[in-house]
């Protein structure tokens, strides 16, 4: 009986050590939340498209870890990705940087597609505080993934941008 009791105590101590070790591990990096871009802002956002027969839809944002310093005021930064849809229905994902997702804010083109199809200023060109924001910045690829994961199943798409 004594050996069984000792075995149980040993197993209990081992379990306690395992639990404590698990509690001291670094927490996993939280996943970046997909924030739906306000549908009320879509007409204003679409106004920046070069071709008026192109439209934007399925817009999602992910908050950046960095902020934009605009005239000494720190503003939040969000990577905004959306489908740019040609008149034939073909879609490609573009990525921009914005300071707001529920009200009008500053907008900058980040991805090659955004630069090609919209008139929004490029990051770093007009505002030096946006120079460090690229498609490789944390949050940019995640915002593209939000768009790809939330596309309607019936849309015609081209080769998606790499997340």
Listing of model-derived features with the role each one plays in the protein:
Residues 2-12:
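Bacterial N-terminal signal peptides that target proteins for export
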Residues 17, 27-28, 140:
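Processing junctions and N-termini across compartments
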Residues 21-22:
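C-terminal motif of bacterial Sec signal peptides marking the signal peptidase cleavage site
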Residues 27-85:
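N-terminal secretory signal peptides
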Residues 79-163:
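Extracytosolic low-complexity repeat regions of secreted or lipid-anchored proteins
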